[in-house]
Amino acid sequence: MTRVDIAYSASQLARFMTNPGPSHFKAAIRVLVYLRDTAARALVMRPDPVRGLESFVDSSWATKFSCSGGMFFYYGCLFHWFSKMQRSVTLSSAEAEFFGAMLAAKEVIFIRELLIDLGFIIDAASVIKCDSKSAVGMAFDPVAFKKTKHILRAAEFLRDLVAREVVSVEHLPGAVMLADILTKAASRAVFVELIKQLDTFA
């Protein structure tokens, strides 16, 4: 998949590949029409040596399995992303966001090791940006884990990475959360604005 702007749509459609209905076919046609109308778009790399490995992660809380999305940048260039359903049931939006941060952290670990193998020097914590202050607090506060025993392993995994300064979880206002387009069907205005903020397409 080479278009981050259709990642959420493609992920949702893939869930119904074994038993698609008329509504899914109609949605797939809309995606194809969008791709036709934006065929000239491409990923643009504008390296910024000041920026290291950073990621943006968001989750949309659902009554059962939430959807998480993440974007990963190196030197300010988008090179990897995901949009997928969580495998664990979370009991609040904060837990869903925290679990999304854990998924992003797993990707970051793999990416860091890959970059090191390629000869890059990674000597600073990789930043994971999340739009939930509660989720950020859970990554630093041991007391918070008493309320999250059902996702204890994920909590311990992420907190260990934070303690070892492998990753750093930071809050980012929802209005500028780029990963929002990977977790829900945004309105046209919001979608267009986030794509502009992404500053990756040309």
What are the residue ranges of the model-derived segments?
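Conserved active-site beta-strand-loop modules that form the wall/rim of enzyme catalytic pockets
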Residues: 6, 40-42, 52-54, 69-71, ...
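Conserved pre-motif C helix in the palm subdomain of viral-like polymerases
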Residues: 1-8, 60-69, 93-110
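RNase H-like nuclease fold core
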Residues: 55-94
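Structured nucleic-acid-interacting core domains from mobile-element enzymes and related host factors
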Residues: 33-59, 120-122
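Conserved helix-loop functional segments at active or binding sites
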Residues: 37-41, 62, 78-80, 110, ...
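C-terminal reverse transcriptase regions that engage the nucleic-acid substrate
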Residues: 1-41, 173, 181-183
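Active-site-proximal structural scaffolding
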Residues: 24, 36, 65, 104-107, ...
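RNase H-like nuclease module associated with reverse transcription
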Residues: 16, 52, 84-202
